[in-house]
Each structure stands twice: as C-alpha cells, then as structure tokens.
Amino acid sequence: MARPLVPSSQKALLLELKGLQEEPVEGFRVTLVDEGDLYNWEVAIFGPPNTYYEGGYFKARLKFPIDYPYSPPAFRFLTKMWHPNIYETGDVCISILHPPVDDPQSGELPSERWNPTQNVRTILLSVISLLNEPNTFSPANVDASVMYRKWKESKGKDREYTDIIRKQVLGTKVDAERDGVKVPTTLAEYCVKTKAPAPDEGSDLFYDDYYEDGEVEEEADSCFGDDEDDSGTEES
C-alpha cells in the first residue's frame, strides 16, 4: 500500500525548525503548541535591553498555511500589546506577512510583501524591528500611533506611550514566572546563542532550556538595541 504524500510545507517547516535549533535567533524562543503539529508554533519574545521593552516576556502564535512557504503564516500576539502596528486582536500589521499580490491601494511594493524566499527567521527579525521602529503611516492602532508620535515629537517628554509599554512589561513578569522562564536583562544575556541538543526520541522537537553556557556575539551591534536613533530606546 502506497504511503500518503507528505505536504512539502511539512518538510519546509521541519527544516526551519532544525535550523532554529542549531542557530537560534537572539531574543526568541519557539516551541510547538501541540507536539507533532508543525503548523502551529508558540513564540516567546524577550524585550531587547536598552529599550522600553527591556525585561518583557511577550507570547505570540505563528500559524502556517498548508501551502507554506508560498503563502505567509499569520502572526498574532497573545500578550496584550500597545503598539501602532498591532491590532487589539494581537494581529501584527507588517508587510512581510501580507500575501504577494499587487495592491496599489496598500501603499506597499510587491517586493516588500511575502515571497517564498522568506522564512521564520526573517519574520522574527522583522517583528522585533517593528517593535522598536513603528510605522505610523498605516497604523493598526490609531490611538497608539498618535501617542507614539507625540512621544517622538516631544523627544521623550510626553511619556504616555512609554508609560503604557512599561506597565505591560511589568505585567509580563507573572507569565515568565509561571512558565519558568528567565528573561534576559543585559545585552550579553540577550545576545547569547546556544545550540539545542538533538532531541531524544519521543521528546519535543524544540529545545527547552534557552539559557545555557554559550559565547556572546563579538559584534554587539548585531543585536537589537544598540542604535542611538532607535525609537524604542530609552532616553535620559
């Protein structure tokens, strides 16, 4: 009897999963929502040091379509986020997650949208960049966008936007403690890279211990949070 065909998306996701095990992205931890289901990932995002998100533990979900990587996954925050480009539902409004169609009304170039050469790693890097550099030209949360622009234009004197973010960061500590997660608070901790050990047979496909002994990246600027002009960087 012939074996059922395995969708190519499963093979692609398995390869990406292994790649993220061997070369983790700084500031992220990924697990499966349900063991054995490659189409639903849980993502933990750690707030980059030297930004208003420092010390934060933000949880999200990545849901992949059956025709991945030809169609983009959906990225939704489970943690409540106050951000110009995040809807109240937690859905993220970012070009890389939009289908590769020519839509002149969107204001986006086709090259800015999803294409099959993109992957989970590029999505994660785009999301962390978006947190620090919101796009106020096409906001998903208008009120957050207005607050952010006031903060930006006042050069940090108007703190309504950042005060909300800091309150949300403090609120995530409960989730981190409940999940037994140690959140990085220094650049050295944030930039540490560890290689996940090969999973035992029958174990979860992902590594469980993010923080192990590892080498800190020699180039600190390879990590998020060093740019003096970053909009999310705390000002004195």
UniProtKB/Swiss-Prot annotation:
| InterPro entries per UniProt | Ub_conjugating_enzyme, UBQ-conjugat_E2_core, UBQ-conjugating_AS, UBQ-conjugating_enzyme/RWD
Sequence segments annotated as region (SCF-binding): 190-236
Give the species this sequence originates from: Homo sapiens
Reported effect, S231A? Abolishes phosphorylation by CK2. Impairs nuclear localization
Report domain UBC core positions.
8-174
Q: Where is this region: Disordered?
A: 216-236
Any idea what job this protein has? Answer: E2 ubiquitin-conjugating enzyme that accepts ubiquitin from an E1 ubiquitin-activating protein, and catalyzes its covalent attachment to other proteins by an E3 ubiquitin-protein ligase complex. In vitro catalyzes 'Lys-48'-linked polyubiquitination. Cooperates with the E2 UBCH5C and the SCF(FBXW11) E3 ligase complex for the polyubiquitination of NFKBIA leading to its subsequent proteasomal degradation. Performs ubiquitin chain elongation building ubiquitin chains from the UBE2D3-primed NFKBIA-linked ubiquitin.
Which consequence is recorded for altering N85Q? Inhibits both mono and polyubiquitination of NFKBIA
Stretch list, region Important for ubiquitin transfer: 98-113
The protein's name: Ubiquitin-conjugating enzyme E2 R1
